[in-house]
Amino acid sequence: MKSFKYKNLIVLCSIFIISSCSSMDGLRFWKSDEIDPDEPKELVAFSNQKNIVIEWKNSFKGENEIGNFLPDFSAQNLFFSDASGNVSSINASTGDRNWSIELNFLASGTSAGFGLVVVSDIDGNVIAVDQNDGSKLWSTNVKGEVLSKVAIDAKVVVVKTGSGELLGLDRENGEILWSYRSKLPLLTVRGSSSPVIVDDLVYVSFDNGRLG
């Protein structure tokens, strides 16, 4: 008799478990073949839309295939450079070109601020020109390829080379004021992260994974 009761109890428990699982779709371990999990969801329609008005546009003949030549903004002007050595100043309001110069082939650019526009050429020269007319102010060879934008403040221009060296150049004449060299790992890819100056402190990430 006890055996019969136990069998009935087991059957009832089994029925309860099966019925519970069938009503809980989220706990099912199988899915219908009609549902494709990789199918993208339907896009939501947005009613709050605005049209973009183009105030002006300009074009440049140089290329920027690896993204090392982002423009910069300073004193109501935009500054551009490219790998061919073209450096230009554009009025941000009108799109009119203020000036254009040609330098040696460049490795990176463009940083602007405190009256300077700074780029770096393929021979390791950091070149500063005047924001107002593009005249060359100074050039300093840092003995290493510079693939990242420099950082500029009122006193110093901070440069990071591909060999892991960080240098501070005098903003007025380009003289090397100080330098710091990080230890590169045995296997590394040429780094291109840019230094940042905040409250007289320089922040930079090195190829060995350290943040200084």
What kind of region is each of these model predictions?
Residues M24-L27, E34-P40, S47-D72, R97-F114, ...:
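Extracytoplasmic beta-rich repeat domains
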Residues D82-S93:
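Beta-propeller domains
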Residues D82-A83, D121-I122, T161-G162, F206-D207:
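Structural signature of WD-repeat beta-propellers
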Residues N91-T94, D130-D133, D170-N173:
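Short loop/turn segments that connect beta-strands within beta-propeller blades
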Residues K2-I10:
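Bacterial N-terminal signal peptides that target proteins for export
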Residues I18-S20:
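C-terminal motif of bacterial Sec signal peptides marking the signal peptidase cleavage site
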Residues N77-F79, V117-V118, V157-V158, V202-Y203:
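Conserved beta-propeller blade signature
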